[in-house]
Amino acid sequence: MLHTIVRLTGFGSVIRVTKFHMKIISWNTRGLGSKKKRRVVKDFLRSEKPDVVMIQETKKEECDRRFVGSVWTARNKDWAALPTSGASGGILIIWDSKKLRREEVLLGSFSVSIKFAMDGCESLWLSAVYGPNNSALRKDF
């Protein structure tokens, strides 16, 4: 993380800008039921080494430790999930728990939002959204 003091010309104000590098991957997987698809996702994440992974359309009713481990093999991880509603949907957010600490999780009908604490920075909110492809459900979206 890098902290910089910036003076805004003409305003007489000074602000502190915090710059940090974070790799976030967001992916609509269209289901993670097959081992083959989970292996493709796992291999990709292993090669990219993200800090946060947001997966839409997991099509999973439950995302337990074993399932999450089959997708992302990083040792220090935490996650939050919104289960499927019927045969579609489902959101899973996984993150490196050494870099980000969960402060709050909000599960919406079509979203997962997480407030993270980061060393030396203000809190950060990240959200993953998956909208329904059903016209009757879209009005609730």
Q: What residue ranges belong to the model's regions?
A:
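Short phosphate/oxyanion-binding micro-motifs
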Residues: M1-F141
